[in-house]
Amino acid sequence: MTGGDISPLPRENFPMQACIIGRNSPRLLKIFLYLICLLSISSSAFAEELDLQLLIDAALRNNREMLAAQSRVGAYTYRIPQAGSLPDPMFTFGYQNDTLSSYTYGQSPDSKWIFELSQTFPFAGKRGLREEMAKADAESQKAAYEALQRRVISKVSENYYDLFFAYKSLDIIGDRKALFSSMEEAALARYSSGMASQQDAIMAQAEKYMLQEKEEMLRQKIQTLEGMLNLFVGRDTSLPLGRPSAAREARLYETLGELVKKAYDRSPEIRAKEKMIAGAEAKVNMSKKEYFPDVTLNAGTDQRGGDYTNMYKLTASINLPVFFSTRQEPAVKEAQAQLLETKHELEATKLMISSSIRENFAMAASAQRLMALYRNALIPKSTQDYEAALTAYSNGKADALTVVTRLKALIEYEVLYWNQFSERQKAIARIGAYTGDLAQ
């Protein structure tokens, strides 16, 4: 298949002669050619029929945005032990001499080697709060990753059904072009017998050419959709895909209220915001802990040498939060404001999810009703009208415009039927991204 060809190659076009390996061929060459044949056949099978589940599986494995999010989750997870760890201890060493002119170690009581070790201990509870904040951030990223998974599945499903609809539209237009050809033949027959003007045949030809224009536009749309699907599954966007297999009709069995409740219970977006709130609450508590000082313990020895006794010391130092009005108090207010912001974001997320589910539920229900209308009433009636108009035109009892109008209406209703089918499938996929009931 070339880059510009969107239709899958028929099985008979594959160079199967290349798969015939002579007995005198070297062993390695035989193995190599055999593998090439297997890859060619498997690739052609993938190109002939496109399965939604295979696309979803490929996207979950290879989508670049998801791989980046997965690495981000790992990075945040590694922050947890860092946040709960003690600061590194400090080792200090040096030498103090009595004069600048000579080395007086062991000769003067003021000459000595100094060795000290110090360790800072945060005030009780600070390390636990820092670890709690880091853990909440990591869990929020995990929930965000799950939400991204669902969005990717939903987007793959949406583009898949758009591609399905584009191919269905091509089928309809291809079939109906034959009907315009029949009308053209009837118009030419009537024109040759003097029963109609040449304008009737020209009208049929013009409509047929307009359908060819739509075919070309659909082929361009198919290439665009294939590029989008390749992007989601992590493949080269120029690679062709096959035709979507027969789509399984999705159904909604819950009421609107049940779907909204399920989304609230299962939505990773909501869970991510809840984890962010937990982290913000820990930050508020942490900022309040900053009013209390940390303690630094220092142990050291002065080695004086000679007849002088060595000296040992143990000290403790604390930081004094004397500038609390410009440091600790604003920090507490900042953390409280961020907590309030996160709570508002949670409520906004719930409203957004509820609104989106309501919108897509209405779209799915409307599409279901319209499909029934097209399938049971408009398409059968339009088919009868077209057949009656064509028969009447052949008998000289109707004009060409009537036949063209009836046929265009039939094409429009058939395309609209499959458009509503595609829109319903996409709406249900979007709902599934919130509830977790994704059609895979």
Label each region the model flagged:
Residues 132-135, 198-206, 400-408:
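Short, charged, amphipathic alpha-helical segments
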Residues 89-147, 271-349:
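Small/polar-residue-enriched beta-strand and adjacent coil segments characteristic
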